[in-house]
């Protein structure tokens, strides 16, 4: 019988991961035990993926509010600091902000509008239109924002982030002034010491600030890049990709992940004889069409992966072939013709026959699949096993 199933993505249950656990052994054992219990076999070019959260937990990669405060104070002077373009998230930024506030005397908090970088709205575009506000040029004080738009709560969490962040800063004994603007250089009218908290546009923000005369400029990726009093750290991403662990501690994005994925690949090869690709994944980079949230608060989808996951898909669009090249064929004759075209394909970059085949990196595509499979709550499946991803219609 012809094969009837293509790509399969399985969430693999494993023990709760604690600091110091052997994640290589746990991952390999869990994947092989799942395969044995469900009656399927490992194959060459399967993909095993591990969520960044359990990697960081096993590493013990944590930082406290006091650690963050100490680093902010050392790098930005401890006086008045402009904190610009943070995302609106209790999980992703609130504990970091508590540490930042503890390391300053005053924060000028500059929020982007109508939404943050990943789509959390402070106001709607319709509200801006009605108020005749130009988000590209207009700078709003807190008073003007409240006068025009009142209280705006997040549609899902019902949090008024302007009030929430202001209260959090004051709780740390730090003064706060709130403005809304979208040009990072506006902050230099208030202070020359700036912590730019954007994620994917951070390099440009830093460049513009330095060119405009800022004295001290850091991004979140410059805070917690080395241990503070024995804390965790991430030399490449700092606080980027961190999230709440407790009320006074964050879990940092994992480090040294390449050694992990290569070790998992080697153990799977030793125990199964199969060459399996391995990656660590975080946010899946998909966008919610209703809430308008871009699921990429991490600096990258995958901080590490085996070499076989480098590149982009090289695929033909079956419906294009069926509707154009082989429009006069049907049934077995059409199937044979399409299989022949697939077997004969070369590099399809720029080819009309490949249009609509999602030109994204493999790690980003597979990371989306993994994040959607594992979820972010109580499924208990931080390991994903994907089979058939690299197969096509001929396999």
Residues covered by each model-derived region:
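Conserved mixed alpha/beta catalytic, RNA-binding, or beta-rich assembly cores of soluble enzyme
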Residues: 1-44, 53-395
């Amino acid at each position: 019988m012809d094969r009837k199933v293509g790509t399969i993505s399985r969430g693999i249950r494993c023990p709760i991961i604690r600091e110091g656990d052997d994640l290589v052994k746990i991952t390999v054992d869990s994947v092989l035990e799942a395969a044995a219990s469900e009656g399927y076999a490992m194959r060459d070019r399967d993909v095993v993926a591990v969520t960044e959260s359990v990697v960081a937990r096993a590493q013990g990669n944590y930082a406290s509010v006091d650690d963050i405060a100490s680093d902010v104070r050392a790098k930005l002077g401890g006086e008045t600091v402009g904190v610009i373009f943070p995302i609106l998230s209790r999980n992703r930024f609130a504990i970091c902000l508590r540490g930042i506030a503890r390391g300053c005397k005053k924060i000028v908090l500059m929020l982007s509008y109508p939404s943050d970088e990943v789509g959390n709205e402070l106001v709607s575009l319709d509200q801006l239109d009605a108020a005749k506000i130009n988000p590209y040029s207009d700078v709003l004080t807190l008073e003007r924002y409240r006068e025009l738009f009142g209280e705006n709560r997040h549609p899902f969490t019902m949090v008024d982030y302007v009030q929430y962040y202001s209260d959090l800063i004051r709780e740390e004994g730090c003064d706060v002034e709130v403005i809304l603007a979208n040009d990072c250089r506006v902050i230099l009218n208030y202070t020359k010491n700036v912590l730019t908290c954007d994620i994917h546009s951070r390099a440009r923000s830093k460049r513009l600030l330095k060119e405009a005369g800022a004295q001290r400029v850091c991004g979140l990726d410059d805070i917690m890049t080395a241990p503070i009093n024995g804390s965790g750290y991430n030399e490449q991403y700092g606080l980027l990709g961190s999230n709440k662990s407790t009320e006074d501690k964050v879990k940092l994005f994992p480090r040294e992940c390449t050694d992990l994925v290569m070790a998992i690949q080697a153990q799977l090869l030793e125990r199964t004889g199969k060459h399996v690709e391995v990656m660590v994944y975080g946010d899946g980079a998909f966008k919610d069409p209703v809430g308008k949230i871009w699921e990429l608060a991490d600096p990258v989808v995958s901080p590490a992966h085996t070499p076989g996951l480098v590149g982009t898909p090289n695929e033909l669009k079956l419906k294009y072939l069926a509707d154009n090249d082989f429009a006069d064929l049907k049934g077995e004759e059409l199937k044979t013709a399409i299989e022949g075209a697939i077997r004969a394909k070369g590099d399809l970059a720029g080819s009309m026959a490949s249009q609509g085949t999602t030109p994204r990196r493999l790690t980003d595509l597979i990371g989306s699949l993994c994040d959607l499979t594992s979820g972010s709550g109580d499924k208990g499946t931080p390991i994903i096993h994907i089979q058939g991803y690299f197969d096509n219609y001929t396999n």
